UniProtKB/Swiss-Prot annotation:
Residues 64-90, 152-173 are extracellular. Coiled coil: none annotated. Homodimer and heterodimers. Regulates membrane-cell wall junctions and localized cell wall deposition. Required for establishment of the Casparian strip membrane domain (CSD) and the subsequent formation of Casparian strips, a cell wall modification of the root endodermis that determines an apoplastic barrier between the intraorganismal apoplasm and the extraorganismal apoplasm and prevents lateral diffusion. This is Casparian strip membrane protein 1. Keywords: Cell membrane, Cell wall biogenesis/degradation, Membrane, Transmembrane, Transmembrane helix. It holds the Pfam family CASP_dom. The keyword Lipid metabolism does not apply. Residues 1-42, 112-130, 195-202 are cytoplasmic. It is a multi-pass membrane protein. Its main location: membrane. It comes from Striga hermonthica (Purple witchweed).
């Protein structure tokens, strides 16, 4: 009888210990799963960030090197079109250069988020910076898109002639730069959404 009682007591203690360890084990598994999810988001963030930087850099270089001179000229005039003839395109180059610089400098923060997926500080800085630069890129791309539209179609009410019939290469390059800028804007929006998803998991 004493042996049976002793055996019963040992089983009860073992059961009690396992009940105490079960919540801790479940919490650890949940923490690892959340960290793995955030690490996956951070890796995708890094890929999109590099892609956005590439698009913004391409837009800056293409617009900043856009120039066309027509093969005919007069004694007093030479027909040439450059991006800096229009203040809107100058703003585009400066704005997209700032966006490019920010995206390149933000890559180390994205890498930190991969190494430390549960860290909130770097992710919060990224979402603030991405939002500000998305606004800048949108304003640069949107204002330049309006000028490109006028260059292609003109405005008969204001007697603004379309110049793309004469400066075809110029218009193609500035149009390509604006398209690349909008690609960067879309990628920045995706980056903001990813950062919001990662912060929401906290």
């Amino acid at each position: 009888m004493e042996k049976n009682k002793s055996t019963a007591i040992e089983i009860a203690e073992s059961s009690k210990e396992s009940k105490g360890k079960a919540p801790l084990l479940a919490a650890a598994v949940g923490h690892d799963r959340a960290a793995g999810y955030k690490r996956g988001v951070s890796i995708f963030d890094l890929f999109l960030r590099i892609s956005a930087a590439t698009a913004a850099l391409a837009a800056t270089i293409v617009m900043g090197t856009t120039e066309q001179t027509l093969p005919f000229f007069t004694q007093f005039f030479q027909f040439r079109a450059q991006y800096d003839d229009l203040p809107t395109f100058t703003f585009f180059v400066v704005g997209m250069a700032i966006v490019t610089g920010y995206l390149i400098l933000s890559v180390p923060f994205s890498i930190v988020c991969i190494a430390r997926p549960v860290a909130i500080g770097p992710r919060f800085l990224l979402i603030v910076g991405d939002t500000l630069k998305a606004v800048l890129a949108t304003s640069a791309a949107g204002s330049s898109a309006a000028i490109v539209y006028l260059a292609h179609n003109g405005n008969s009410d204001a007697n603004w002639l379309d110049i793309c019939q004469q400066f075809n290469d110029f218009c193609q390059r500035v149009s390509g730069a604006v398209v690349a800028a909008f690609v960067a804007v879309v990628l920045l929006i995706f980056l903001i959404v990813l950062s919001a998803m990662a912060l929401r998991k906290n």
